[in-house]
Amino acid sequence: MSFESTFEGLCEKFRILKQQLSAPETLGTQAFVVASREYSDLLPIMSLIEKYKSTQKEIAELEELVNSASTDPELRSLAKDESHIKQKLLPKLRHELQLSLLPKDRDDSRNAILEIRAGTGGEEAALFVGNLYRMYLKYAERKNWKVETINISTTGIGGYKEASFSIGGKDVFARLKFESGVHRVQRVPETESSGRLHTSAATVAVLPEVEEVDLKIDEKDLRIDVYRSSGPGGQSVNTTDSAVRITHIPTGIVVIQQDEKSQHKNKSKALKVLRARLYNLEKQKREEEISKMRKSQIGSGDRSERIRTYNFLQSRITDHRINLTSYRLDYVMKEGDLDEFIDALVADDQANKLKQITH
């Protein structure tokens, strides 16, 4: 389908929706609600189409003036200049229109749950989890996003076996979803006397946060165990059975929550994580059925499956998916200045989607 015919089809759809919304018999019905939502979604696209078409019309009228033998020389010169300006604007408008037609990820407006886990590399990998955790906290702070800790599992000497937390705010999942995958670190550990460079890894999973109304979980599918929470080394933290382990029997997914002193709060947080994981599982199945272009697996934590490498010796960060390298590692890690990478990943994703709809 050509570029122009796509827009003609959208204009026709917009006209039909307008008719449906003005029909008295649809008022107050579910059909009215659906049509109203579709109409609102199309409004900004229709505005761009109108601008694109009017620019095309203006160019045609200006070219007619330029090519007319009766046009005054001074007016012809002005018309030629104006036509040149409008022709330069047209590709930009066309690109904006193409972007507006890209398939939307319905989860982009959701909040996110991040789960960072140590991969290969022992204690050094656990320390790197802490680096990534603090980096994302700083990034959230820069964006004025709200962070809530879900589960922190430390190693006792400054490292983290796991750090999971939710982030809420504008465009959270839309921007952070590209962080899913294996992050590799190359540096000399403080305990390394020979100064030898070590390579370790951590996995990052970014899940869309799901409300209870979006995903119902049957109580019959859950096994809920309660026990006393424990800290590093296994010592008891609470004298009451406040820790909660929820097993989703059909999938085998297990969520453990013990950060809160209240059993009720731990259960609530565990269910939030379980909903996100189940939703993500269903989403992955849908994506695999529709297209093999993108998969959301984060890998096993093996160093070879990396999406990004952090080389502390060279102060270098390289994102291997888009071949982008920055030598501002210290600032990125300590200040959470991730926009250079995330903006580039968003642009790359848009470019790939454009190829899909234009070929």
UniProtKB/Swiss-Prot annotation:
Superkingdom of source: Bacteria
PTM characteristics: Methylated by PrmC. Methylation increases the termination efficiency of RF1.
Entry keyword DNA damage: no
Alphabetical list of Gene3D superfamilies matching this protein: 3.30.160.20, 3.30.70.1660, 6.10.140.1950
Origin species: Anaplasma phagocytophilum (strain HZ)
GO cellular component terms given for this protein: cytoplasm
Stated family: Belongs to the prokaryotic/mitochondrial release factor family.
Protein encoded by which gene: prfA
The name this protein goes by in its record: Peptide chain release factor 1
Biological role: Peptide chain release factor 1 directs the termination of translation in response to the peptide chain termination codons UAG and UAA.
